[in-house]
Amino acid sequence: MKPASMMLVLALLAGAAQADEPAASAPAPSNSVAAPNPFDTVKMPGGVEYREIAIGSGSSAYPGSTVLVQYTGWLQNPDGSRGSKFDSSRDSGLPMTFVLGEGKVIRGWEMGLQGMKVGGKRRLIIPSALAYGAKGSSSIPPNSNLIFDVELVGVQ
């Protein structure tokens, strides 16, 4: 037998031997969907976005409940990052207290605080229409989107 023919026969035999081995099983297709990460950013109807920083374990905030909130607020830069700080309850150490749902705070807070539990921390990204809008406020220019880090310290 010629060397080239011998090589061909050996190659065919080697391939046939490998074909007899069981093929590695492919993973079975899965219909399950990975659970969403509770720390992903969530966009609410109306445009408020929030991201859980820490999930609380106490009572939940709901309309009609008196909430105590520590917060820091920043203007949002055009690239989405935090801009200059305009207010913080942490500067005084006293939480802001109000009844959720009575319209005493900006609408973005009314929406973004609902469902939080005492001890929870969230970052809220609030479009200008749900903040101070075209009028702005003393330290907030008109049409500014805002970023707040909030901590729910109590519910009554």
Q: Which positions does each model-derived feature cover?
A:
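Cross-family detector of peptidyl-prolyl cis-trans isomerase
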Residues: 2-156
